[in-house]
From Swiss-Prot:
Belongs to the glycosyl hydrolase 33 family. The gene is nanH. This is Sialidase. It is an enzyme of class 3 (hydrolase). It comes from the Bacteria. GO terms for biological process: ganglioside catabolic process; oligosaccharide catabolic process. Its main location: periplasm. It catalyses: Hydrolysis of alpha-(2->3)-, alpha-(2->6)-, alpha-(2->8)- glycosidic linkages of terminal sialic acid residues in oligosaccharides, glycoproteins, glycolipids, colominic acid and synthetic substrates. It is found in: Periplasm. Pfam families: BNR_3 (PF13859), BNR_assoc_N (PF14873). The active site is at 399. BNR repeats lie at residues 239-250, 318-329, 378-389, 425-436, 485-496. It comes from Bacteroides fragilis (strain YCH46).
Length: 544
């Protein structure tokens, strides 16, 4: 009895001792951006510390989730990012600069040593990682960040989950305030095109298809001098993958005009590509706008009525009969489809489709005689030899994507200059007449940006349901929060439960979707971490 009383008294004494805790709070923000497999540093966590009393950050303890494939992780690092400028106080930033550039040629794969000091690195980690810091703190805001590097060969569908278990300041556990959501899954990606690749300043405007052989073909603008639109030195580039997007072959140029007609390359730009696979023949078509001359001014304003290449943009095709390996000389179809009164005719960038009856369809857009843009479609009934256009679907719309939602029924999903949400229209006669879809201008938020839409039939996916799959920046202002959404009712509703945020960061916003196999959707898009980023997502990660 006496022993029990002594033990109880000791327990009460220990409980009365205050927990030793650091005076300063550390704010933690976990990222939701692609983890590029080829990148040496991917930002996993940002740490913001207002050092009012603390002198030293001793260490950070990180826990990796139980389902993480540890054998795929090369290393985890702790970096110190310095201090905050006084004029930035109150902005609650988590970094003074971009530690890893997405736009500076040659500097997109690793942390810029000018902006960070590496304090610790743990290779081949276990489930718990201790990152030693021993970093002297300066009065005011101090920044730290945690980097993740994956091994080559990491699966594109792998995911990493992690949380900060503890951070020690001056030998005491710090109070952590996590400002990001719980349960974030970090998804893998591949930077198909980085700034500076092949001596090009920028890569923009993705299109993506899967051939009958399972080959992925990604097209895009190769913008050599800057990221600006035509007219400029721009070619249409293509990257080809035969392993589901893990690796990509050397870039090809399906369309490039060089110094055609005695004008410099900067006045022979061709771009904003759209690509389709003729599923009946496996022929592949790329369509793009070619601008000849125009004095390096923006083609949107410099293309004029008429048909002559010196005054109006030309609509050109390239064809591949060998699964995207080689490409034909340019085929000019301007005379077939352009009204001479229009200022500018071009495709809807991204992709086209083959209908169930074999008709080839590309989305289009044109600036009419009153200088108002309008979205529509063009189609071919003879395998791409001849093309026709009828009427626009909705006025004051531009970049669109088309999907066959029922046999012979096409849905056109359009960028609308009015802003706020996507415009959607239906045609049953290849664009001769259009009706507004019930979801138009209310179901899909947009900030006036290109988007992607594909239809996947029940027999072609693991869910066994007819799917409409959509991607865009899920916001009405700015371009960020790139998201994949799935509709199970033909696009009438897009449930939040069937959406997956891929990239919260600011980016150019364009994307294109294509099925990799029955279980997996692929997306090529302009992300916050690389100009052309590819990710693979299991359908069951979206429809659970």
């Amino acid at each position: 009895m006496k022993k029990a009383v002594i033990l109880f008294s000791l327990f009460c004494f220990l409980c009365a001792i205050p927990v030793v805790q650091a005076a300063d709070t550390i704010f933690v923000r976990e990222t939701r951006i692609p983890i590029l497999i080829e990148r040496q540093d991917n930002v996993l966590f940002y740490l913001r510390l207002d050092a009012k009393e603390s002198q030293t950050l001793n260490d950070v303890v990180l826990n990796l989730g139980e389902g993480v494939n540890l054998s795929e992780i090369q290393s985890i690092k702790l970096y110190y990012g310095g201090t905050e400028a006084l004029q930035d106080s109150g902005k609650k930033r988590f970094a003074p600069v971009g530690y890893i550039s997405s736009n500076t040629p040659g500097k997109t794969l690793a942390a810029n040593p000018s902006y960070s000091i590496k304090k610790s690195e743990v290779t081949n980690p276990g489930n718990q990682v201790v990152l030693k810091g021993d970093q002297k703190l300066f009065p005011g805001i101090n920044y730290f960040w945690i980097s993740l590097q994956m091994k080559p060969g990491t699966s594109l569908t792998s995911k990493v989950t992690a949380d900060i278990a503890s951070i020690t300041l001056d030998g005491k556990k710090a109070l952590l305030d996590v400002v990001s959501e719980n349960g974030i899954e970090h998804r893998m990606g591949v930077g198909v095109r980085h700034a500076g690749d092949d001596n090009s300043a920028a890569f923009r405007i993705p299109g993506l298809v899967t051939t009958n052989k399972g080959t992925l073909l990604g097209v895009y603008d190769v913008r050599y001098n800057s990221s600006v639109d035509l007219q400029e030195h721009v070619d249409v580039g293509l990257s080809r993958s035969t392993d589901g997007g893990k690796t990509w072959e050397k870039m090809r140029l399906p369309l490039a005009f060089g110094e055609f007609g005695g004008l410099p390359a900067g006045q022979n730009g061709v771009g904003d590509p759209s690509i389709l696979v003729d599923t009946k023949t496996n022929n592949v078509w790329v369509v793009a706008a070619w601008t000849h001359g125009m004095g390096n001014q923006r083609a949107w304003w410099s293309s004029h009525p008429g048909m002559d290449m010196n005054h109006t943009a030309q609509l050109v095709l390239a064809k591949s009969t060998d699964d995207g390996k080689t490409w034909s000389a340019p085929i000019n179809i301007t005379e077939q489809v352009k009204d001479p009164s229009w200022y500018f005719l071009l495709q809807g960038p991204g992709r086209g489709i083959t209908m169930s009856d074999g008709t080839l369809v590309f989305p289009t857009q044109f600036i009419d005689s009153t200088r108002v843009p309008n979205a529509g479609i063009m189609y071919s009934k003879d395998g791409g030899k001849n093309w026709k256009m009828h009427n626009y679907a909705r006025t004051n719309t531009t970049e669109a994507q088309v999907a066959e939602v029922e046999p012979g029924v096409l849905m056109l999903n359009m960028r609308d200059n009015r802003g706020g949400s996507r415009a959607v229209a239906i045609t049953k006669d290849l664009g001769k007449t259009w009706t507004e879809h019930e979801s138009s201008r209310k179901a899909l938020p947009e900030s006036v940006c290109m988007a992607s839409l594909i239809s996947v039939k029940a027999k072609d996916n693991v869910l066994g349901k007819d799917l409409l799959i959509f991607s865009n920046p899920n916001t009405t202002k700015g371009r960020y929060n790139t998201t994949i959404k799935i509709s199970l009712d033909g696009g009438v509703t897009w449930s939040p439960e069937h959406q997956l945020l891929l990239d919260e960061g600011n980016n150019w916003g364009y994307s294109c979707l294509s099925m990799i196999d029955k279980e997996t959707i692929g997306i090529l898009y302009e992300s916050s971490v690389a100009h052309m980023t590819f990710q693979a997502v299991k359908l069951k990660d979206i429809i659970k």
